[in-house]
A protein has these predicted regions:
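Glycine-rich phosphate-binding loops of nucleotide-dependent enzymes
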Residues: 2-319
Length: 319
C-alpha cells in the first residue's frame, strides 16, 4: 500500500539531535501505556508518530512535554530558546528570527513550564483556546513565558512592563501573519472557523520561541482543503529551522509530510524509518494500515476524536 506523493524537501542539511528520548516507559497502576520507547529528533526534521487507537502516542507526547513523569527512561533536550525580534522590526517570516546555537543534550525535568522555557512547545488533540479572547490575545498569552516583568511591575504597569507588552503585541501579530491569520487579529477565538482555530493554536505555541514543536492530530476534523493548508504550514515551520513531531491518523498526510515515521503498537515501538519503509512494512500494514479501524476515535481517552466546534472553542488554560 503506497500513499506517498511528491513532497517538498528541506534545503537544510540534517542537523544535530535536538531531542533524545531513551527507554521511556509509563505505567498507570497495572496498565503499561508506554513501554521502552526511544526517539531521536534532529534539527529541521519532521517526524511522524502513528499507531492504532490506544497505542500510547499521546501518552508518549505527555512524557516528552512534562505533563507526565515517566516511570522510567529519560528525555534529553538540546534547545536554547530563540531570541525574539526587536519590536521595531516587523516581519511575517520566522526565518528573520536569529537563533542561538544549541546546547548539549541535557535531561528535561518533568515540569511543563520548564519544558516550554527550554524550547519545546506543543498543541493538543482537542482545541484549547481562550474562547472569549481575540486571536491576538490568545497568541500574546503564549508569549508571556518569554517576558521577565515581575508581578509588582505588571500591577504597576511601569516602563519595563509597557516595553515588554508592546514587544509581545508586535511578536503576536507577526506570528498571526506567519500562520495566515493576519486579518483575524481582533476576531474572537470562538467565532473563528475550525481550521483557523487550529492555526491559532499553532501560532500560540510558536509564541514561546520553541526549537521543537509537537503537534497532536493537527488535522483532526479538517476537510481536504484545510488539511493541505495545514501541511503547507508545517513545511513552512520546518523551513524556518524548527523541528516538528506530528501525531496523526491520516496516513496520506503523515507519509507525504514526514522525513521519518515511528509506528507504536500497544505502547511499544514497532517500526521506525522513512515513510516508504514504514508504509511497506508488513507489520505496519497488519497492525495499523490494514486493520480498517476507525481512525477518528481518540486513541488515549477512549472517546470520540475532536469534532468541529458548533458554538465556541474550548476555554482551557495550557500549561
Amino acid at each position: 500500500m503506497t500513499v506517498t506523493e511528491s513532497r517538498p524537501t528541506s534545503t537544510r542539511p540534517a542537523g544535530q539531535p535536538v531531542l533524545e528520548a531513551s527507554g521511556v516507559t509509563m505505567r498507570f497502576g497495572g496498565l503499561l501505556a508506554v513501554n521502552d520507547v526511544s526517539l531521536t529528533v534532529h534539527e529541521g526534521e519532521i517526524v511522524g508518530l502513528i499507531g492504532p487507537n490506544g497505542a500510547g502516542k499521546t501518552t508518549f507526547f505527555n512524557c516528552l512535554t512534562g505533563l507526565y513523569k515517566p516511570t522510567s527512561g529519560q528525555v534529553r533536550f538540546a534547545g536554547t530558546p530563540r531570541k525574539p525580534p526587536r519590536a521595531s522590526k516587523k516581519t511575517s517570516d520566522l526565518e528573520a528570527v536569529p537563533v542561538q546555537p544549541l546546547e548539549p543534550l541535557t535531561p528535561l525535568p518533568p515540569k511543563p513550564r520548564a519544558v516550554v522555557r527550554a524550547g519545546m512547545a506543543r498543541t493538543f488533540q482537542n482545541i484549547r483556546l481562550f474562547a472569549n479572547m481575540t486571536a491576538l490575545e490568545n497568541v500574546m498569552v503564549g508569549r508571556y513565558c518569554r517576558t521577565s516583568s515581575a508581578a509588582l511591575t505588571s500591577v504597576l504597569r511601569g516602563p519595563k512592563f509597557r516595553r515588554e507588552e508592546a514587544a509581545t503585541r508586535v511578536r503576536a501579530q507577526e506570528l498571526l501573519d506567519f500562520v495566515g491569520l493576519g486579518k483575524s487579529t481582533e476576531h474572537l477565538a470562538r467565532n473563528m472557523p475550525y481550521g483557523d482555530q487550529r492555526r491559532l493554536e499553532i501560532a500560540r505555541a510558536l509564541a514561546t520561541d520553541p526549537k521543537l514543536i509537537l503537534l497532536d492530530e493537527p488535522t483532526a476534523g479538517m476537510n481536504p482543503q484545510e488539511t493541505r493548508q495545514a501541511s503547507d504550514l508545517i513545511f513552512k515551520i520546518r523551513d524556518s529551522g524548527l523541528s516538528v513531531v506530528v501525531i496523526e491518523h491520516d496516513m496520506r498526510f503523515i507519509f507525504n509530510l514526514c522525513d521519518r515515521v515511528l509506528c507504536l503498537v500497544r505502547g511499544e515501538g514497532l517500526v521506525e524509518g522513512t515513510p516508504d519503509e514504514v508504509q511497506s512494512d508488513p507489520r505496519v500494514i497488519e497492525a495499523y494500515i490494514g486493520t480498517g479501524e476507525d481512525d477518528d476515535e481518540d486513541e488515549d481517552e477512549g472517546t470520540d476524536a475532536p469534532q468541529r466546534p458548533q458554538d465556541e472553542a474550548g476555554e482551557e488554560e495550557t500549561p
